[in-house]
Amino acid sequence: MFCVQCEQTIRTPAGNGCSYAQGMCGKTAETSDLQDLLIAALQGLSAWAVKAREYGIINHDVDSFAPRAFFSTLTNVNFDSPRIVGYAREAIALREALKAQCLAVDANARVDNPMADLQLVSDDLGELQRQAAEFTPNKDKAAIGENILGLRLLCLYGLKGAAAYMEHAHVLGQYDNDIYAQYHKIMAWLGTWPADMNALLECSMEIGQMNFKVMSILDAGETGKYGHPTPTQVNVKATAGKCILISGHDLKDLYNLLEQTEGTGVNVYTHGEMLPAHGYPELRKFKHLVGNYGSGWQNQQVEFARFPGPIVMTSNCIIDPTVSAYDDRIWTRSIVGWPGVRHLDGDDFSAVITQAQQMAGFPYSEIPHLITVGFGRQTLLGAADTLIDLVSREKLRHIFLLGGCDGARGERHYFTDFATIVPDDCLILTLACGKYRFNKLEFGDIEGLPRLVDAGQCNDAYSAIILAVTLAEKLGCGVNDLPLSLVLSWFEQKAIVILLTLLSLGVKNIVTGPTAPGFLTPDLLAVLNEKFGLRSITTVEEDMKQLLSA
């Protein structure tokens, strides 16, 4: 096992990365190794997808499957080894079908890629794990050095984050051939184990630029189906009655669940990154979508144990449900998996609803505590002139984009402390689950404009980017000249690709934490600092002073 893709990876003087019987996320060595094997199979599939496009062959089954299967290897998504192997087998079957299509056009069709003809050696998981050792990401570290390995992983993990967003967009009916062609090209190239530093740096920026397009079609999919989010108050306390909790990012799953629970007497609560769903008109119209439950994903083993109903996980993040013994009432969807946990293969939630009706539910309603979400792209753009007016009248001094992932590390209290000392004449724009560090605190307003503005899920960084570009255009300056600072927390690969997206768009002087990614060496961090001004957090007071004076 070697995995260094998330923020909580093991760090030692001898090197970074989880390389024992089990990773910090709870992933076993077996599952981790089989995910490496799956990635190799997907790289071979992408190699043939690139070749097929040369002949004008576009296989939509391949295009929809490849990013979805890659998504299953993202942190805290799928811990189920047999399902990972199933994805690998499907990747190889699709590859062979695509290869046959190519050969039907050109009998001499060939692909020069070491993954292009990969076959699984056995049905036995142990044998497959041994085969996977051939594809462990650091297998040639001694030959290429830590810097090249780090850049490879930056590209691989960034592309993995983009693949997750591609899957979210695809679920909503969004497809862009140019994006998929670019994805396959990059995925196939990474399967050649590239070792050119400049080429890898360029690839990381290409991934960022591609992901901006992905976020654009995801935004179109969400707003096209469910309307543009508008400011909405959400209750974060319990309401009496039967209940289901739904977590993750998949708004379509939430919509289907709301449709199927309507009239059943079962209330639905969002959790984690599903919180922004309350801002969408076509979702909040369901009166039994009664609130949001819990805090950051890392607290789920305590909070899920207390929830008196079933739980549905639609995407990341799931952690071991057996520890607090709620594994009999947690359900997985789509690419999510945990051994022994029931999986929903389709859109039918009737078994979950039946279970909810058989459980006690909340016995009484708690005193409501309302927070506000729903500052989507359209709402933010509508406020652009107000923001400019407040700045011109010196009522608004600075905007802090304070968001990103949450996690268990104690140093993450930095983001709570930072939010609480933001001056009263400054605004906090937040997104993703890092908001749970401070989104239940009171921040007041500036002439009626809330000082805490929740823009949505992690992918809604797109809305923040569009707002920044709009403000810069109206003020006749560059984005980096705005009174705007980005203080981002990271945990997994979606955050990595958001960072690459920002850097590829030329955004500079981003501050990140709580730690630097374990796969980035001091040399690579120095390069990113020199090129983009990217740096790690220090102390709340010092960072605030520096950002306000910039």
Curated annotation (Swiss-Prot):
Taxonomic source organism: Shigella boydii serotype 18 (strain CDC 3083-94 / BS512)
InterPro entries from the UniProt entry: HCP/CODH, Hydroxylam_reduct, Prismane-like_a/b-sand, Prismane-like_sf, Prismane_a-bundle
Cofactor: how bound: Binds 1 [2Fe-2S] cluster.
Lineage of the organism: Bacteria, Pseudomonadati, Pseudomonadota, Gammaproteobacteria, Enterobacterales
Enzyme Commission designation: 1.7.99.1
CDD domains: HCP (cd01914)
Subcellular location: Cytoplasm
Cofactors: [2Fe-2S] cluster; hybrid [4Fe-2O-2S] cluster
UniProt keyword Transcription, yes or no: no
Name this polypeptide is given: Hydroxylamine reductase
UniProt xrefs under Pfam families: Prismane (PF03063)
Gene3D superfamilies in the record: 1.20.1270.20, 3.40.50.2030
